[in-house]
């Protein structure tokens, strides 16, 4: 169970509004990483995009956690197979290790991500973000998610990537993040909170009647 899922929380916001469980466009949702505030942007009586206050990023190594003598992990060098990586580590309620690569399209995320995820310096394992800088307002990102492998997108990972890139002077405070599954807009607020804006789309609906599965949800 993850502490927080940026994409998932947008979907929950859309679900509760579209299903008329709330008529509010400003809602709060409790997660294992704390209470998050969502601004639901409605179009044609349904949620189109969601802006999430993802909170203040955690940079202290012992809180992420990362085993290192450095208080803030901004230049963690790890050697994996035939490559050397420099990581900036951030927690958005869950741990992330962000590194810059030259060409994200050709990068073997599985080969390196699977090893980095379980590196001994990450006692709780980690999500690994591989980032290509296009310009100060646009980056491309692929992610190896802890316990899941490469996924099409990761909301907390996009936030962590922008925090890391800004910390290293590579990007501005508002950045468009291009992921395999679509784009997210990330803003570093003056209040030090990270704000994520992205779409939420209904893919399908169905009913679950399997007694064994229903028992697990109770």
Regions found by a protein language model. Give the residues of each.
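Active-site proximal loop and beta-alpha junction motif in alpha/beta enzyme cores
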Residues: 1-4, 9-151, 163-218
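Helical hairpin unit composed of two closely spaced alpha helices linked by a short loop
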Residues: 156-159
């Amino acid at each position: 169970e993850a502490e927080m899922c940026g994409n998932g929380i947008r979907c929950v916001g859309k679900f509760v509004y579209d299903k008329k469980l709330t008529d509010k466009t400003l809602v709060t949702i409790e997660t294992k990483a704390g209470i998050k505030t969502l601004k639901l942007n409605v179009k044609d009586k349904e949620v189109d995009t969601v802006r999430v206050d993802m909170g203040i990023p955690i940079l202290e190594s012992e809180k992420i956690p990362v085993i290192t003598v450095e208080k803030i992990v901004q230049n963690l060098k790890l050697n994996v197979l035939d490559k050397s990586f420099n990581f900036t580590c951030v927690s958005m309620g869950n741990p992330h290790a962000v590194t810059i690569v030259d060409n994200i399209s050709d990068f073997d995320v599985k080969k390196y991500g699977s090893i980095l995820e379980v590196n001994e310096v990450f006692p709780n394992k980690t999500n690994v973000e591989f980032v290509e800088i296009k310009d100060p307002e646009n980056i491309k990102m692929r992610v190896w998610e802890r316990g899941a492998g490469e996924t099409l997108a990761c909301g907390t990972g996009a936030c962590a990537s922008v925090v890391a890139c800004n910390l290293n002077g590579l990007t501005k405070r508002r950045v468009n993040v291009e992921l395999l599954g679509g784009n997210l807009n990330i803003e570093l607020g003056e209040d030090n909170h990270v704000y994520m804006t992205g779409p939420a789309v209904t893919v399908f609906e169905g009913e679950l009647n399997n007694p064994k599965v229903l028992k697990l949800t109770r």
